[in-house]
Structures are given as structure tokens and as C-alpha cells.
Regions:
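N-terminal ligand-binding/catalytic initiation module
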Residues: 1-105, 111-113
Length: 115
């Protein structure tokens, strides 16, 4: 893998990820978590003003080829946005920044398929 940082837009995400792939990925990570090869970071939340909020959560897959990632997002009355930062879990190198709205929707939909 090269050391180039990738930026993926919402369009990029939906062009390469679909529900079957998301189900497969979630299943694999739940198995890894059961084997103590993956961990989740509890969600953090802060609020301000009249209903604005910021959120963060993350997970890591340990071992060779593992990744650590954080989804962060903000909601305000004027709008919001979300990003996923993906790191190499061994080197700590930032591999990608991914626009995360579609990614989150696919994950939420796919978890039902895992069940």
C-alpha cells in the first residue's frame, strides 16, 4: 500500500460499497471482536445552544493489516456533516478521510442483515 492519503466523497462511497459488502464487513468485525481482535470506543457527545451537538465514536481492528477509525459529526440548526478518519493500526499513519453520511446509512442498514 502506498503512503498516499485518500479522500473519499459520498459519491466514492456509494460507488464501491453496497449492502451485501457492508453486511460481510460488519459480520467479519463482529467475529473479530468476539476473538478480542477488535474493540469499540464508546460514543462521546457534547451539546450546546439550541439543539446543536457533536459526536465521536471509533473502533480498531488489531493485528497485522488492522485499522483504527473514528467517525465524527456535528448537527446544528443550519446543517451538519460527518467524516470518518481511517488510520493504519500498526503505524498510526492516516490512510483516508471519508465523507461519512452514506457510510453511516449503509452500516445502519446492514447491521439488520447481520442479525
Amino acid at each position: 500500500m502506498t503512503d498516499a492519503l485518500r479522500y473519499l466523497t459520498e459519491r466514492d462511497v456509494v460507488s464501491v460499497l453496497d449492502i451485501p459488502k457492508a453486511i460481510e464487513a460488519l459480520h467479519a468485525m463482529l467475529v473479530a471482536q468476539g476473538r478480542e481482535q477488535a474493540r469499540n470506543l464508546p460514543k462521546a457527545l457534547a451539546t450546546w445552544g439550541d439543539g446543536s451537538s457533536m459526536h465521536a465514536l471509533g473502533s480498531v481492528q488489531t493485528g497485522a493489516g488492522g485499522y483504527a477509525g473514528f467517525k465524527t459529526w456535528v448537527h446544528t440548526k443550519s446543517g451538519g456533516g460527518s467524516l470518518f478518519s481511517l488510520f493504519d493500526a500498526e503505524s498510526g499513519f492516516l490512510r483516508a478521510v471519508i465523507e461519512a453520511r452514506a457510510l453511516g446509512m449503509l452500516r445502519t442498514a446492514a447491521i439488520s442483515g447481520v442479525a
